[in-house]
UniProtKB/Swiss-Prot annotation:
Main location: membrane
GO molecular function, one term: pantetheine hydrolase activity
Name listed for the protein in its UniProt record: Vascular non-inflammatory molecule 3
Localization (cell): Cell membrane
GO biological process: pantothenate metabolic process
Record carries keyword Cell membrane: yes
Organism: Mus musculus (Mouse)
UniProt similarity note: Belongs to the carbon-nitrogen hydrolase superfamily. BTD/VNN family.
Length: 500
């Protein structure tokens, strides 16, 4: 039997926040859900059998939703694939799908469940929102029939979409979003012809929505923030952590800071697939996060956020190459060597002392590092790495990355492999690069995959990620992760289908 694990400190915090809050602030909740998965099959199950599995998952989500509502939460986000999992073909997912109408129809499924056919999942979610007076965001599947008059209609005569839905506190369907940037294994779904910029207004700010892999792309992730001026983003995800550079919590939290919005990120929980890492992030700080590779339990997180963070002072825009372009490359007297991180070939140079200045370059990108360790350990090796190129595995997107990281062993061939702990502590550091993009996401991950607290580091206006002093930090990885959107390849094909 699945169980819920709710941190006592999070619940206690919310009691305080509820007492002092107003609609200038709101209580956000996210739930990291250990999804009950279907048995793998090559033949579709019946609609009744599919609904049985869906309801088992919603039973767990219901407990989290009710507890969040009792603690004063105004909105809760649940994960991508959170009600049926991800082990599907195009045919086997079909019994799990419902026809989800455009929210403009002004529909409360809890009151009128048969208005758009058989929609038990939408009815149950609507009733949960209505009965608990809370906004609920859930990820479900949408189906839309098509025919030969549509040149993009799939051979089976239907579109199938990975879909986010939001029900407001009265149970009304208030938002629907079809995922645009499908992850390569999502063969069960189509992507819409055009990206959808989906927003909705609440008494506690304006919200935007996208899903998991969308966050890597300009459209819709950056566009919905820039063009619609949302205050907060809802991010359901089924994110498997690919250390050292693509762990959910560091990437989602720094995206919130870089884009100047709140991010409510709910991940699925499956340790066998390295899926964990949910959080509530503001532009100023990480409010609360959860990362757990030890248990198989779900986790509810709650935090108070400003409803309209854009109305508050924001840091000046960073010129990410300003400092680095004034620096003459440091000479270490040793040759660079290649190494791979998530299939991308980096150029690495080894740090050989307890303090120093290093430069490593690849194509147009030169990365500069100045550092001082508390002591140099013989059993731990660190490298400075640079990557400037097109990532081509499980998606295609152009990256410029500068990173300081610990190698898995003292053998340089393990540099770039996942590492869990570090004992070397850095007292001072400054990392910069000659980036050709303004979309650079700085992150620092410490031993045990913990985030470095904001008080220990800063980003200067001239593009340096540098220490502020205080306690020495046991760094696993420090990175400036740049996305060069204008160098991404074009999407192949204009209609629904599998991304190439």
């Amino acid at each position: 039997m699945a169980s819920l694990h709710f941190p006592q400190w999070a619940v206690s915090f919310v009691f305080f926040a509820q007492a002092v809050g107003s609609m200038d602030t709101f209580i956000a909740a996210v739930y990291e859900h250990a999804v009950i998965l279907p048995n793998k099959t090559e033949s579709p199950v019946s609609t009744e059998e599919a609904l049985l599995l869906i309801n088992k998952n919603i039973d767990i989500l219901e407990s989290a939703i009710k507890l969040a509502a009792r603690q004063g939460a105004h909105i809760i986000v649940t994960p991508e694939d959170g009600i049926y999992g991800w082990i599907f073909t195009r045919e086997t997912i079909y019994p799990y799908l419902e026809d989800i109408p455009d929210p403009e129809v002004n529909w409360i499924p809890c009151r009128d469940p048969r208005r758009f056919g058989y929609t038990p999942v939408q009815e149950r979610l609507s009733c949960l929102a209505k009965e608990n007076s809370i906004y609920i965001m859930a990820n479900i599947g949408d189906k839309k029939p098509c025919n030969a008059t549509d040149p993009h209609c799939p051979p089976d005569g239907r579109y199938q979409y990975n879909t986010n839905v939001v029900f407001d506190s009265k149970g009304r369907l208030t938002a629907r979003y079809h995922k645009y940037n499908l992850f390569e294994p999502e063969i069960q779904f189509d992507f819409p012809k055009d990206s959808e910029l989906v927003t909705f207004d609440t008494p506690f700010g304006k919200f935007g929505i996208f899903t998991c892999f969308d966050i890597f792309s300009y459209d819709p992730a950056v566009v919905v923030v820039k063009d619609t001026q949302v205050d907060s983003v809802l991010l359901p995800t089924a994110w498997y952590n690919t250390l050292p550079l693509l762990s959910a919590v560091p990437f989602h939290s720094v995206w919130a800071r870089a884009m100047g919005v709140n991010v409510l990120a709910a991940n699925t929980h499956n340790t066998s697939m390295h899926m964990t890492g949910s959080g509530i992030y503001s532009p100023e700080a990480v409010r609360v996060y959860h990362y757990d590779m030890e248990t198989e339990s779900g986790q509810l997180l709650l935090s108070e956020l400003r409803s309209r963070p854009r109305q508050h002072a924001t840091p000046a825009e960073v010129n990410w190459s300003a400092y680095a372009r004034t620096v003459k490359p440091f000479s270490s007297g040793q040759a660079d060597f290649p190494g791979k991180i998530y299939f991308d070939e980096f150029s690495f140079t080894k740090l050989t002392g307890s303090a120093g200045n290093y430069t490593v370059c690849q194509k147009d990108l030169c990365c500069h590092l100045t550092y001082k360790m508390s002591e140099s350990r013989m059993d731990e090796v660190y490298v400075l790495g640079a990557f400037d190129g097109l990532h081509t595995v499980e998606g295609q997107y152009y990256l410029q990355i500068c990173t300081l990281l610990k190698c898995q062993t003292t053998n340089s061939r393990t540099c770039g492999e996942p590492v869990g702990s570090a004992f070397t502590k850095f007292e001072e550091f400054s990392l910069s690069g000659t980036f050709r993009t303004k979309y650079v996401f700085p992150q620092i991950v410490l031993s045990g995959s913990q985030l470095a607290l904001e008080r220990y580091y800063e980003v200067s206006r001239d593009g340096r990620l540098r220490s502020r002093g205080g306690a020495p930090l046991p760094i696993l990885v420090m990175a400036l992760y740049g996305r060069v959107f204008e160098r991404d390849p074009p999407r192949l094909g204009q209609g629904p289908g599998k991304l190439q």
